[in-house]
Structures are given as structure tokens and as C-alpha cells.
């Protein structure tokens, strides 16, 4: 007897491909869906090979396969957001925006239109029930854990979402793929932003919004002009390489001012801070933070969680006070909270205090 219909987001990669197999083995009726998200004007359909890989996997596993076009929503909510943030002197995380508005909103809604009871992805996270609520828990594979990107999920989404890969090590996923004869078993993991395959975000923005990129001044902490920069989009907090200025000592970007179009330069010690304000906060084990909590938090995907106090503020904001100084806290990135293995929530870094 079927456990229900699952709409699986297929990317053509090994994780979503093996997820299809696992779900089918567990008794679900799987529908494979590939999202056509964007087209590179220089190359045409940028991900044709990925779509074909996904289609071949679906044929191999004998599951229905569909391609849906979400280009406009992806452009409006991810690409335009990405560009606007850089032009505003912030460093965005497009994967967080994509999960919030595309994978777990647009795709979630598409799954319902296909008559699915659940949606599934190839993300490395676990979904469990604790104290009567669905929560997100770190994956079995610490190196592949993707909970940092998932803090925006709501209860209604978690109740209908399955992430099979969270229960496996990556090597095991590849092993399953090879054993069942999937050609994608040795396909490389994507490391770059999907719509910037050459990893040159500055070049991407320049091609699309060249007129908005303005040269400006490098200034020191006292406001003294010490050089010229080529546009604030090319810089991020903590950056040392590629500044093109010689001060006779290591120089770091410590702030970016979009109003004056200035990039502030300082010493390495200046990029270590302990406090921040985050906006657009979402919590998963509970609806609202009523009082301060002692948790662990991290300010970038690759960082280790560090002890911090999370203090509720008005307008869906929190203040985060770390026990130890954090390197290069960056506006536009996400700060994410954990209680041991459980993802508690997160928000967008708005201000460094």
C-alpha cells in the first residue's frame, strides 16, 4: 500500500537522484520535478545537461518526470535580491533566499498542484518531531549538513517535507547510486552559486547592472581617503586580497557605506566583534522568542557554532551577543541558532553592534 504521493525536487545530482530511489523503496509514489530557474543570455538554457541527467534518472527508476518553469519568481526573489544586496553594501546568501521563496514556497505549491501529499529534496537535514512540533536536526554527515540554510521553514512546510539524505553519509549516498546503476553516482557536488557558474559575482552584476557600479574611495577609520575602489559590490567584510592598496601592513575591509560609496579599511583586530542585530527572524521549535535564550550561533555556513545569548527585540528582530569574538560578521549574511543538534532558527544580519 502506498504511503502517499511525493513530489521530489530533482536537480540531476546524486543526492536528489538517490532520494528518489530511497522514497520509492519506502513505499511512496514518487513524482520527479525539475525546476527551470534561469537562463544565461550568453549561453541559452544554462542547465540543459542537469535537466537531462534528472530525466534519465527518472526513466531508470520508472517514475513520472516533469519540468516546471519558475524563472520569473527566481529572478524576482533570488537574482534581483542578490544584486540589490550587493549594491547596498551587503553580502547576501542566495541559497537562503532560494530555500525560502523557491524550494519551500514555489515548489511546495507546485507539489500540491501535482496532487502530492508531500514534497522532498536532496538536502542533508533531518526532520523530527519534538514536543509536539516538527523540528530540523543536523544531518548524519556533519561535513554535508545543510541546516544553516533551512531556518526559514514553517510548521506547515515541515509537516509535508521529507529529506531522505539527512540520514546518510555522503559516501553511502554515492555507493547506493553506483549499486543501482545511476550514471550520476560520481557527479561532482556544485560549489558555486547556481546562476553564477564561474563564481564571479562581480562580473555577473557588471554584465546586468553596469551603470549602477560606481568607483569610490577607500577610507581609514578616521575617514581619511587612502585610495580608490572599483565599486562596493567587489568587497565584503574581512576581505584582504584584491584590494589594490599598499599601506605597508595588512589591510582589511571593516565596513562598507553604500550612502557615501566608501569602503572602510582597518586592521585585522577590527573585524572581530561580539554583537549583532538580526532581522526577519524565524524560530522553528516555537513561534516567538519571549525571553533571552542561551544557545549556540554561527554567522556563516562554514563556521562552527559558538555560545551566544539571543535577546528578543521588537519588529521581529533579535540581538545576538557572542561569548567569544567572531571573525568578519557580515551584513546580509544569516546568523543561525542551535540547541545542540537542533536548529532553533535564524535571521539576516542587519547591524554589527
From Swiss-Prot:
UniProt cross-references to Pfam families, sorted A to Z: tRNA_Me_trans, tRNA_Me_trans_C, tRNA_Me_trans_M
Marked site: Interaction with tRNA: 123, 333
Domain of life where this protein originates: Bacteria
Annotated residues for binding of ATP: 9-16, 35, 122
Record-listed E.C. numbers: 2.8.1.13
GO terms under biological process: tRNA wobble position uridine thiolation
Family the entry assigns: Belongs to the MnmA/TRMU family.
Function comment: Catalyzes the 2-thiolation of uridine at the wobble position (U34) of tRNA, leading to the formation of s(2)U34.
Protein name: tRNA-specific 2-thiouridylase MnmA 2
Species: Clostridium botulinum (strain Hall / ATCC 3502 / NCTC 13319 / Type A)
Amino acid at each position: 500500500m502506498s504511503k502517499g504521493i511525493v513530489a521530489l525536487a530533482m536537480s540531476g545530482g546524486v543526492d536528489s537522484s538517490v532520494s528518489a530511489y530511497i522514497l520509492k523503496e519506502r513505499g511512496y509514489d514518487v513524482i520527479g520535478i525539475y525546476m527551470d530557474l534561469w537562463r544565461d543570455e550568453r549561453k541559452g538554457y544554462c542547465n540543459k545537461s542537469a535537466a537531462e541527467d534528472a530525466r534519465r534518472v527518472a526513466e531508470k527508476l520508472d517514475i513520472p518526470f516533469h519540468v516546471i518553469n519558475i524563472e520569473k519568481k527566481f529572478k524576482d526573489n533570488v537574482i534581483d535580491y542578490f544584486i540589490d544586496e550587493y549594491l547596498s553594501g551587503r553580502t547576501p546568501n542566495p541559497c537562503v533566499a532560494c530555500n525560502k521563496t523557491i524550494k519551500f514556497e514555489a515548489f511546495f505549491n507546485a507539489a500540491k498542484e501535482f496532487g502530492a501529499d508531500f514534497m522532498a529534496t536532496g538536502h542533508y537535514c533531518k526532520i523530527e518531531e519534538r514536543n509536539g512540533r516538527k523540528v530540523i536536526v543536523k544531518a548524519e554527515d556533519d561535513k554535508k549538513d545543510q541546516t544553516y540554510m533551512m531556518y526559514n521553514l514553517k510548521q506547515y512546510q515541515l509537516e509535508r517535507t521529507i529529506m531522505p539524505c539527512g540520514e546518510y553519509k555522503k559516501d553511502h549516498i554515492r555507493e547506493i547510486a553506483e549499486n543501482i546503476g545511476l550514471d550520476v553516482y560520481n557527479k561532482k557536488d556544485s560549489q558555486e552559486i547556481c546562476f553564477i557558474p564561474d563564481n564571479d559575482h562581480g562580473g555577473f552584476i557588471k554584465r546586468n547592472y553596469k551603470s549602477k557600479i560606481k568607483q569610490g574611495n577607500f577610507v581609514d577609520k578616521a575617514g581619511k581617503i587612502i585610495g580608490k575602489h572599483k565599486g562596493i559590490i567587489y568587497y565584503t567584510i574581512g576581505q584582504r586580497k584584491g584590494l589594490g592598496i599598499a599601506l605597508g601592513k595588512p589591510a582589511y575591509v571593516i565596513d562598507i557605506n553604500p550612502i557615501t560609496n566608501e569602503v572602510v579599511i582597518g586592521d585585522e583586530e577590527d573585524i572581530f566583534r561580539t554583537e549583532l542585530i538580526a532581522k526577519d527572524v524565524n524560530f522553528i521549535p516555537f513561534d516567538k522568542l519571549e525571553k533571552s535564550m542561551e544557545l549556540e550561533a554561527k554567522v556563516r555556513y562554514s563556521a562552527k557554532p559558538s555560545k551566544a545569548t539571543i535577546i528578543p527585540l521588537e519588529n521581529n528582530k533579535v540581538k545576538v551577543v557572542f561569548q567569544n569574538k567572531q571573525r568578519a560578521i557580515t551584513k546580509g549574511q544569516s546568523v543561525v541558532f542551535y540547541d545542540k543538534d537542533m536548529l532553533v532558527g535564524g535571521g539576516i544580519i542587519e547591524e554589527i553592534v
